[in-house]
């Protein structure tokens, strides 16, 4: 078993004395830093490598802090309109996970880089901390690497804003089987469009 395998097993037992101490120290350290900053190296090298990170030119790690809790509905001057059933403002739950929100915020700040993936690093009562793996599509080390140069294509710009990363896909309801009948055809919208379209068959 390699060294990364041992590190992976450590992170599976987050309630152990070692991990509780380590995460407590790290959360304190992250709390002193700004909300968004570049990390010199990944805090979880085993996880980063499993998600595609390489310690080479063109790859970078950015750490971001996201506020925990539900999403308050943005209503101007408290005007919700419609029927009382849809007047809720406070107790609404967001469709997307906080990890997907973190990827989006990093991607917006760094428009010239591409979001490859992200992972959880720590959390406290008020915030969750994620590290996002960014790739520079203009760097020659990336463009010449056959394993990762797919991300240089223009079609992969802002993958995080279109739900194409691992965290983004989790909230799209994609899958196979009877539980995922609401996304047959590729997406919720495609499924709705197919079911609600008027089909006028021509019989000859």
From Swiss-Prot:
Protein name, entry field: Large ribosomal subunit protein eL15
Gene name per UniProt: RpL15
Family to which the UniProt record says this protein belongs: Belongs to the eukaryotic ribosomal protein eL15 family.
GO molecular function: RNA binding; structural constituent of ribosome
Any single GO BP term: cytoplasmic translation
Gene3D superfamilies: Ribosomal protein l15e
Top-level taxonomy: Eukaryota, Metazoa, Ecdysozoa, Arthropoda, Hexapoda
Record organism: Anopheles gambiae (African malaria mosquito)
Cellular component GO terms, alphabetical: cytosolic large ribosomal subunit
Key words, A-Z: Ribonucleoprotein, Ribosomal protein
Superkingdom in the source lineage: Eukaryota
